[in-house]
């Protein structure tokens, strides 16, 4: 079974690192389970359950909290969920403090770990290139802030300031809780309401959300080059989805992405990698919160011009309807299959619902997959028509 508790807050440069370190600090212990050893013993008693700190970025919203992976009561024939829910609530609400402040030794230790995580981002060159693209492409927007914040801000984390941020988050953040398991929903709600009843709540921050920019920042795409000692160059191209984000039709966007570069039968994969051998890897990613389509590709540096030309040409082909019925069928099958697979594992299902909830949508994965299967050629061409290239990294 699965439980996730997420506190939502606006992603801002000045608070991102502070917010990102919090679940790691809280996971180190609470008044009832004061250290990692006590927590480990408690979780062993719950058949090896896991409670993990999480930091997500959903458009310009930062979500922090805990995920718990544990044996389902129905399979065990005994109740462990109430105890596990109490453990998660205690870690969240009753942290290890000294004089009413988060413990300096724990904060210092987790600050060092956070800085190490931020520095390690460069090791995954593909996702690093995408993050650097966002930094330049969305330079005037909150979306430019990385999920874990900036290293310079992480270095300034102090236990007094972090304690203030913690109390602020608890009282003002909307909270999204997802449970996946065999217990009746009403009973789950009762248990969670009970264990979280001491959570201090003030005026909720109703202003959190993502600002969607329809057009590129400048008339012509911007080009950014950074030099790193790498065996394989990384090319990342950022597009704004444009006018279709005025009333986004997610099923159409899922099919558009699958057709363009989101699966192994896509335009980008079959042409850039298979037919022309211009890259080692290529794919497109969709951010439906922010209205972005991103292409990332591992290339030989001397293939840069040709690869960029071909990436543009394949999007033009999607725009003009230059794709076969079979290509469209494969894209629909891939997008629908991905959605149905989300329901197969509790973690991917909870992640799906967190995204939909933030978007204000109440459509489950099978329903979304059914809508994907109704997408037409004209739908895809219409959505692709407004896409504009903003930045090339």
Each predicted region: which residue ranges?
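His/Glu-based metal-binding/catalytic segments typifying zinc-dependent metallopeptidases
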Residues: 1-18, 167, 174, 193, ...
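Short, polar/flexible loop-turn hinges at active-site or ligand-entry regions and domain interfaces
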Residues: 29-32, 73-77, 94-103
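Short proline/glycine- and acidic-rich turn/helix-capping motifs at secondary-structure junctions
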Residues: 105, 207-220, 326-337
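Short, low-order "capping/linker" segments at domain edges
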Residues: 115-120, 218-232, 337-346
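Non-catalytic, conformational "gating/processing" segments within enzyme and secreted inhibitor domains
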Residues: 159-195, 392-393
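Bilobed periplasmic-binding protein-like "clamshell/Venus-flytrap" ligand-binding domains
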Residues: 381-393
């Amino acid at each position: 079974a699965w439980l996730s508790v997420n506190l939502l807050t606006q992603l801002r440069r000045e608070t991102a690192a502070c917010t990102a370190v919090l679940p790691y600090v809280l996971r180190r212990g609470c008044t009832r389970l004061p250290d990692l050893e006590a927590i480990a013993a408690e979780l062993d008693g719950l058949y090896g359950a896991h409670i993990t700190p999480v930091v997500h970025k959903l458009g310009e919203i930062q979500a922090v909290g805990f995920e718990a992976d544990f044996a389902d009561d129905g399979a065990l024939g005994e109740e462990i969920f109430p105890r596990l829910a109490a453990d998660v609530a205690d870690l969240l609400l009753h942290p290890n403090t000294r004089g009413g402040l988060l413990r300096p030794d724990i904060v210092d230790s987790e600050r060092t770990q956070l800085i190490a995580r931020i520095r390690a981002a460069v090791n995954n060159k593909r996702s690093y290139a995408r993050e650097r693209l966002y930094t330049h492409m969305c330079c005037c927007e909150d979306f430019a802030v990385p999920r874990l914040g900036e290293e310079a801000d992480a270095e300034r984390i102090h236990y007094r300031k972090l304690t203030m941020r913690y109390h602020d988050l608890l009282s003002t953040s909307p909270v999204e809780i997802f449970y996946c398991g065999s217990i009746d929903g009403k009973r789950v709600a009762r248990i969670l309401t009970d264990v979280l009843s001491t959570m201090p709540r003030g005026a909720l921050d109703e202003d959190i959300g993502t600002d969607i920019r329809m057009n590129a920042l400048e008339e012509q795409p911007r080009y950014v080059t950074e030099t790193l000692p790498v065996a394989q160059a990384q090319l990342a191209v950022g597009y704004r989805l444009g006018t279709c984000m005025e009333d986004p039709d997610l099923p159409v966007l899922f099919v558009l992405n699958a057709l363009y570069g989101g699966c192994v039968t896509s335009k980008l994969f079959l042409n850039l990698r298979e037919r022309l051998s211009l890259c080692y890897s290529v794919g497109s990613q969709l951010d439906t919160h922010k209205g972005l389509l991103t292409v990332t590709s591992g290339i030989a540096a001397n293939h840069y011009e040709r690869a960029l030309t071909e990436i543009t040409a394949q999007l033009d082909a999607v725009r003009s309807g230059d794709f076969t019925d079979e290509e469209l069928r494969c894209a629909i099958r891939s997008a629908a299959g991905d959605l149905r697979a989300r329901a197969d594992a509790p973690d991917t299902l909870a992640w799906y619902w967190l995204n939909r909830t933030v978007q204000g949508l109440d459509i489950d994965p099978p329903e979304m997959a059914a809508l994907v299967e109704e997408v037409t050629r004209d739908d895809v061409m219409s959505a692709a028509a407004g896409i504009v290239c903003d930045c090339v990294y």
